[in-house]
């Protein structure tokens, strides 16, 4: 940790189509080997499909899906007197977004549909309806935190 002042996180440019910083971050999470234009086309195709399916604005549907995947608590390992406890801690807002995006992308990559755009659209569609692998991941994390609530006093 720096002794003098905290480092401000870098500002990322909003995405060109919707002007959303959240969507630009999501594109960066999806991007592989620096191929941003490919990641953008995948995300935009997925959002078009999602908008047609849900009859909502693409950005609204995306934010709704992300909201359903964001975790509020997680567990962190804490070593106390020779034994390791899983201590539930609240998740910072920036990490909340990052985890939600990462889980959506991981779940989409594991799906068996034809194109990545279709997989992503299906995962976002499922997430907006509170089902799918990404939502299940969030529920698992919340369940772990709930099960280890007794160790909450070990927070640091």
From Swiss-Prot:
One of the primary rRNA binding proteins, it binds directly to 16S rRNA where it nucleates assembly of the head domain of the 30S subunit. Is located at the subunit interface close to the decoding center, probably blocks exit of the E-site tRNA. One of its GO terms (biological process) is translation. It comes from the Bacteria. Transmembrane segments: none annotated. It comes from Mannheimia succiniciproducens (strain KCTC 0769BP / MBEL55E). Belongs to the universal ribosomal protein uS7 family. GO terms for molecular function: rRNA binding; structural constituent of ribosome; tRNA binding. Part of the 30S ribosomal subunit. Contacts proteins S9 and S11. Keywords: Ribonucleoprotein, Ribosomal protein, RNA-binding, rRNA-binding, tRNA-binding. InterPro entries: Ribosomal_uS7, Ribosomal_uS7_bac/org-type, Ribosomal_uS7_CS, Ribosomal_uS7_dom, Ribosomal_uS7_dom_sf. The gene is rpsG. This is Small ribosomal subunit protein uS7.
